[in-house]
Amino acid sequence: MNPESFAAGERRVSPAYVRQGCEARRAHEHLIRLLLEQGKCPEDGWDESTLELFLHELAVMDSNNFLGNCGVGEREGRVASALVARRHYRFIHGIGRSGDISAVQPKAAGSSLLNKITNSLVLNVIKLAGVHSVASCFVVPMATGMSLTLCFLTLRHKRPKAKYIIWPRIDQKSCFKSMVTAGFEPVVIENVLEGDELRTDLKAVEAKIQELGPEHILCLHSTTACFAPRVPDRLEELAVICANYDIPHVVNNAYGLQSSKCMHLIQQGARVGRIDAFVQSLDKNFMVPVGGAIIAGFNEPFIQDISKMYPGRASASPSLDVLITLLSLGCSGYRKLLKERKEMFVYLSTQLKKLAEAHNERLLQTPHNPISLAMTLKTIDGHHDKAVTQLGSMLFTRQVSGARAVPLGNVQTVSGHTFRGFMSHADNYPCAYLNAAAAIGMKMQDVDLFIKRLDKCLNIVRKEQTRASVVSGADRNKAEDADIEEMALKLDDVLGDVGQGPAL
């Protein structure tokens, strides 16, 4: 309602009441105006009424919501189901144009504004999380793997002779396939074991660059957040190597935005060396549905080149989800979530260590991994190879999701490349182990339930192993008795034959 509408309302309802309602609306509009002027995430989160007012105001700016609109094109924002329209707050046109995912759509001013505001808020939050010198970013409606592929395809035009991507090994399929899908050959650099941790082999990286030739290498593809006992790559050292050899550097920061340590590594890497782009998942860092990622970097023209590489328009759903989430939380709400995640990591580490010791296991020492933990399974794996896999299945059927039981000796072929010791990030890690991670949104009751159910599962597995050992021992005893009996019978036969020798 505009001032004229309020004035008209005063003729029907007491002016004092109408003015009070007008002031209340102005409070909502003030928050919206500040957002549009500053382009920053508000310190305090909005309530739902402000959010819905803002989204409604944006939606009515799109041509499909114009009163009396006559559409005669092939894409006019028509929706058959009213439920689908409500699900998307009537934002039907998506974002971008055929030549650029960040471009403005003439038919969809509201959706275009939503896209611009979302990208601005996300940039603000990346700075809040620790990468203060980030220059540009945009939300792309693809998960991390395909977003990495988009980065590699953009680099293809800048390095036409390149055919290889240097990649310190991490046993996760999508990041490997992202390189293959882009048409490049991943050069896998095995990690080195330092204590319990698997760390970047810097000498091997540099040796491979010299062997292949820098001009034949598209980029170095490094990783921050990962499953223990692997830890984030040595980003500062890798960034220096990339700067020295003039090789682009793309960082897979899938769920690292929630970790101040991972973000500090990226900030420092960009300060001392070269980082061209870093990619993070929306669902892993902002607790929204799967399907979106943020591509960010320190050189605005290069990030714009990546956005122009995206063919066609794109879904606005991931942008809408993260916009609603950030406006609901505000900076203070998101900072609180980051703080709670750190506290949960310490709590999970303490509880898992106690449980490990109670079962004659130990928590692997991985101080450079700020999110994931690992507990040895030596006492289980020593009895039976399948016991580790069985433990993982038991946890899943008892509604424990996210835990990974990693046996020794797994062999997996991904896009033609065979990984030995798959899931453990190394050909021959010393022991089987169980992973658990303290990611954003985890609560204390999640940790308590996990520890309780893991304890029960470990006890069940051990009882079954003990029973199997007893049965196996009994079978061996029976077999030995049968062998003795058989030998006795044969001896009797021999003696009988001797006693029945021919008469003289």
Curated annotation (Swiss-Prot):
Where's it mainly located?
cytoplasm
Region (Tetramerization) residue ranges read: 1-44
Instruction: Please list the GO biological process terms of this entry.
Output: conversion of seryl-tRNAsec to selenocys-tRNAsec; selenocysteine incorporation
**Phosphoserine (modified residue): where?**
S14
State the SUPFAM superfamilies in the record.
PLP-dependent transferases
Q: What does this protein do?
A: Converts O-phosphoseryl-tRNA(Sec) to selenocysteinyl-tRNA(Sec) required for selenoprotein biosynthesis.
Instruction: State the name under which the record lists this protein.
Output: O-phosphoseryl-tRNA(Sec) selenium transferase
Q: Which organism is it from?
A: Mus musculus (Mouse)
